[in-house]
Amino acid sequence: MKRTFQPSNLKRKRSHGFRARMATKNGRKVIANRRAKGRARLTA
């Protein structure tokens, strides 16, 4: 059986990257929440 996690940096950046987050209102909310919490890393 194939494992479910098949890592790809391109797919990772496209779905969870900074620019992907900033592209939508909800994504910007995610960034804001993570900044407010004081996360060292905001995005993948």
Swiss-Prot record:
It comes from the Bacteria. One of its GO terms (molecular function) is structural constituent of ribosome. One of its GO terms (cellular component) is ribonucleoprotein complex. One of its GO terms (biological process) is translation. It holds the Pfam family Ribosomal_L34. Keywords: Ribonucleoprotein, Ribosomal protein. Belongs to the bacterial ribosomal protein bL34 family. HAMAP family: Ribosomal_bL34 (MF_00391). This is Large ribosomal subunit protein bL34. It comes from Pseudoalteromonas atlantica (strain T6c / ATCC BAA-1087). The gene is rpmH.
